[in-house]
């Protein structure tokens, strides 16, 4: 395939915390598509729009597109880019295909039951409340490098979320993977609202990936086990920054015993442990690895 093609343009719908559609989490905005956002355009109306079709045609013809500068700069400097990593070893589609779309949208909320020290505040309601209470919110935002983070999280509102959810269900045959991240998805009502509305025969074709703190495994009659029984596959990416007393201090107010019990119970469903490296754990990384092995 040519040096501008990227599989993400054909297989991923991504929106960030500021309710902006982008080609992937590494991409900048594109002038032709930035008019679309989850507040005014449903996911598949954006993804199947004439503008997105033109962008896909452009990369198929070898044209570089606005928004993908980070990858192009890496490649021009002789380094491997995210684009090249994503394309590697994959069947590369040339159009939008059924059961091939990876949905990764920040539309389900930011509620989280922990206030982790390394957490970006727009990804955790608890951390955000703590920083606001302590007067450190502006200081934290000043440390962010991406412009979109300055805008903070946007609440879609119930009516708008229901419209988006209906659009996803209507186009469920396109979806291969549902990714839930930001906050604690297992404790978000909207996550379970979407999952429960997907017909059983369709769910069997869909993989679910959840980025979780794994402190809780159930929510109002739903559970991790319910997902495993209903969907094709469940994958858990588990956030963990230390162990024992240090874990409790960093990821306050985590119940370490319950967390490690859940981790052992769902070990086979975990693809990796996600560690936020900071001065609070950087000298203990080998020790942490040995503990969880």
Residue ranges and their predicted role:
Residues 1-89, 101:
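Accessory C-terminal segments flanking Radical SAM cores
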Residues 83-96, 133-138:
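Short cysteine/histidine-rich metal-coordination sites, predominantly Zn2+-binding motifs
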Residues 279-293:
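Catalytic cores of alpha/beta
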Residues 100-111, 120-160, 173-191, 201-221, ...:
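Core AdoMet radical
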Residues 67, 75, 111-115, 122-123:
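Short pre-active-site segment immediately N-terminal to redox-active cysteine/selenocysteine motifs
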Residues 167, 190-197, 221-226, 249, ...:
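A short acidic, amphipathic alpha-helical/loop segment
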Residues 49, 89-96, 157-169:
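A Trp-anchored, charged/polar loop motif used as the substrate-binding/catalytic surface
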């Amino acid at each position: 395939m040519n040096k501008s093609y990227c599989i993400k343009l054909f297989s991923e719908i991504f929106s960030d915390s500021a309710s902006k559609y982008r080609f992937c989490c590494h991409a900048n905005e594109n002038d032709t598509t930035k008019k679309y956002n989850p507040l005014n355009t449903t996911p598949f109306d954006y993804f199947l729009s004439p503008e997105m079709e033109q962008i896909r045609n452009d990369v198929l013809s070898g044209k570089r597109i606005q928004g993908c500068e980070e990858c192009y700069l890496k490649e021009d400097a002789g380094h491997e880019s995210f684009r090249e990593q994503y394309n590697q070893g994959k069947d590369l589609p040339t159009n939008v295909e059924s059961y091939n779309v990876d949905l990764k949208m920040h539309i389900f909320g930011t509620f989280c039951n922990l206030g982790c020290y390394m957490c970006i505040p727009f990804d955790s309601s608890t951390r955000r409340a703590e920083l606001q209470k302590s007067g450190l919110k502006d200081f934290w935002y000043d440390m962010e490098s991406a412009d979109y983070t300055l805008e903070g999280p946007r609440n879609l509102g119930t009516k708008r979320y229901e419209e988006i959810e209906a659009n996803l269900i209507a186009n469920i045959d396109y979806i291969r993977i549902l990714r839930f991240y930001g906050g604690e998805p297992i404790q978000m009502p909207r996550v379970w609202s979407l999952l429960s509305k997907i017909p059983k025969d369709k769910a069997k074709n869909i993989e679910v990936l959840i980025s979780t703190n794994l402190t809780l495994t159930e929510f109002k009659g739903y559970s991790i086990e319910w997902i495993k029984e209903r969907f094709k596959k469940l994958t858990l990416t588990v956030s963990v920054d230390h162990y024992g007393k240090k874990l409790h201090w960093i990821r306050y107010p985590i119940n370490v015993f319950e967390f490690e019990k859940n981790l052992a119970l769902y070990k086979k469903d975990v693809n990796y442990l996600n560690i936020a490296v900071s001065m609070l754990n950087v000298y203990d990384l080998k020790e942490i690895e040995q503990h969880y092995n």
